[in-house]
């Protein structure tokens, strides 16, 4: 059987860039607050790149539908140094923030049904409903249990190289 969503990314393929969004005044204020109150937490506000308004979020969704959804299915699991997102939408955080509902994204997808490959349509719907919403349901219903349970009985803490991206495992460090 042919494989439709596990293709290796060709070297010559051009991966569309995700548009940079101009920061809002509120984003600037919040970044300063985070920098002064959460200095010991992992992460860096200088690398923040997500839209924080409905208008900008819609631009991202439209851009995904025009530039990346067609090849999403083929390269859904591809790993490369060329891009952090490859042909993914990067919309999940925007759903988490309430800028979209999963239903809105599915409705947009239905409008391009028949115009994009089935593996992209099915693959993306599976990502939104089959994985993202399933995991959301797990967290909503079992959050306290998951926080307290140590199913594998792990004892060691994560080393700082996991947070700093210098594990020696190239795909992990690049992520």
Where are these regions (language model features)?
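Active-site "lid/cap" and pocket-lining segments within catalytic core domains
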Residues: 1-108, 115-118
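Active-site-proximal binding-pocket segments
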Residues: 90-91, 95, 99-175
């Amino acid at each position: 059987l042919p494989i439709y969503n596990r293709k290796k990314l060709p070297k010559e393929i051009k991966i569309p860039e995700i548009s940079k969004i101009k920061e809002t005044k509120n984003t600037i204020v919040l970044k300063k607050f985070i920098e002064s109150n959460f200095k010991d937490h992992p992460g860096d506000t200088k690398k923040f790149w997500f839209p924080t308004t409905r208008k900008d979020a819609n631009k991202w969704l439209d851009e995904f539908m025009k530039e990346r959804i067609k090849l999403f299915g083929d390269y859904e699991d591809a790993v490369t140094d060329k891009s952090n997102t490859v042909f993914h939408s990067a919309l999940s955080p925007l759903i988490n923030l309430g800028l979209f509902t999963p239903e809105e994204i599915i409705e947009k997808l239905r409008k391009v049904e028949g115009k994009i490959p089935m593996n992209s349509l099915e693959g993306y719907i599976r990502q939104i409903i089959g994985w993202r919403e399933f995991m959301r349901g797990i967290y909503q219903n079992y959050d306290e249990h998951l926080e307290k349970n140590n199913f594998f009985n792990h004892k060691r803490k994560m080393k700082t190289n996991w947070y700093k991206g210098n594990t020696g495992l190239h795909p992990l460090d690049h992520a």
